[in-house]
């Protein structure tokens, strides 16, 4: 690990509260919307020093949901995502450059369908604080957006029906690594005293 990230706080992505959403043109009529749940990964992050940020995240593509079973099967099939051969997408960051208060451009490499290409995300920190619900873990919340070309990853089928530009939106939460975080003081769950 680079020296700049060595002593920064370490976090683990919360797969329950992390969601990848995407939008792509459906023959010019509308934007087809999909989601992917269950992402996992590790994060090194200090809100006071973006340069120390390191992210390694994995997205389980078999959980793509376009809201329709037939669409889902088509998206996962060999001509598009080919999840049988490439079940995971992975993003590893290489740099994080602050752009505004609580915001940064996080750039790295995205591996998708066997191809690896550079990708930059615009990231906003929503909150860094102890979660109000048990087990009261210190939690960081983020929103991020990015745009990619599906053809850059070899996904070229049905160009007259599916647009090439894919807009990505991510809502993510990460909790402090248990090894890095001291045990919180005991707190009552809301309603416990009633």
Enumerate the language-model features and the residues they cover.
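Low-complexity, acidic/polar, glycine-enriched regions of mature
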Residues: 1-194
